[in-house]
Amino acid sequence: MIRRHFLTTALAGQSLAAQRNPSPGAGIFVEKAASGTPHRGKTLALVTPHLDDGPIFAAGTIAKLLKEGYTGYLIRTSNDEKDSFDLTLGETVLANERDTASMIAALGLKQAFDLGYRNHRMDDVAMIELRGRLIFLFRLLRIDTVFSYDPSGHYEENPDHYVTAQAVESACWMSGGKLDLPEHFAAGLKPHSVSEKYYFARGPQLVNRVVDIAPTLPSKLAAIHSCKTMVTHMVKDVNASLAERKLRLPALAGAGEDAIRQYTSLVFQQRDAAAGQRHGLAYAEEFHYIGPDRGLEEYISRNAVPL
């Protein structure tokens, strides 16, 4: 969806981003590129309501993990029918569906699953239904790592974001339960808990993990650029707002390919540069990360014996 005042925020010196982590470096793990493919055999899911959410907030990290051996999937929970500038609802759904195919190709994801809930109306969706569908996919795909909106994010205006986030959080846990949706097991699925979560947010967030995305920035920009209908909407919104003030930005004139690239660089690349600057990096993405409990595994590694 359209990011709240992204251009205004970028030109104002990233004032909102400064709120995300008031004490840079305190208790924050900086994740950098690993050599080889240490994650071969692992699977990740990007679970968002809107096509552009993942590219904007997490595509650099996802590209890094894919390069290191992960297989990745997109689970898009809404139909994105509201995100265009001058198309009808039906035209918008089709345009964003086509852009979805372009985005997963640009980022290197294996497949997209569209759940098809109506855009901006997900607070009308039964949580238990959405959670059940996610549990099915987490078990089917054997998801190890999830990227999604932070279920504890503050000041979130979009119901699609917080509804999806809350469903993801509970589904990650319940997908490992033997008594949760046991009919799945008759179809050949098995319990499977999601062990890692990378949560992002539009507003203030408890950031505890920063990922160096300088090596994968081109992949991120390509993923954002592939969301053509949505980014065109952003560009045309800015141009329309400026026209009301009798102003124009030559760099964004025409809202074509060049304008999309300029907007992507001006807003999203600069946003990641500001995040990187806070942590001594060229470009970075910030997350609240929840990983596996290492305590039991460490005990097992020290004390387990063969059967």
Report each predicted region and the residues it spans.
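Histidine-centered active-site/metal-ligand motif
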Residues: 50, 158-161, 227
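Active-site rim/loop-helix segments in enzyme catalytic domains that contact anionic ligands
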Residues: 21-141, 296
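Structural signal for conserved beta-strand scaffold positions within catalytic alpha/beta enzyme cores
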Residues: 46, 76, 114-116, 148, ...
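N-terminal secretory signal peptides and thylakoid transit peptides that target proteins
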Residues: 1-14
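Boundary at the C-terminal end of the N-terminal hydrophobic targeting segment
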Residues: 17-18
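Residues on a specific face of well-ordered alpha-helices
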Residues: 98-102, 165-166, 170, 218, ...
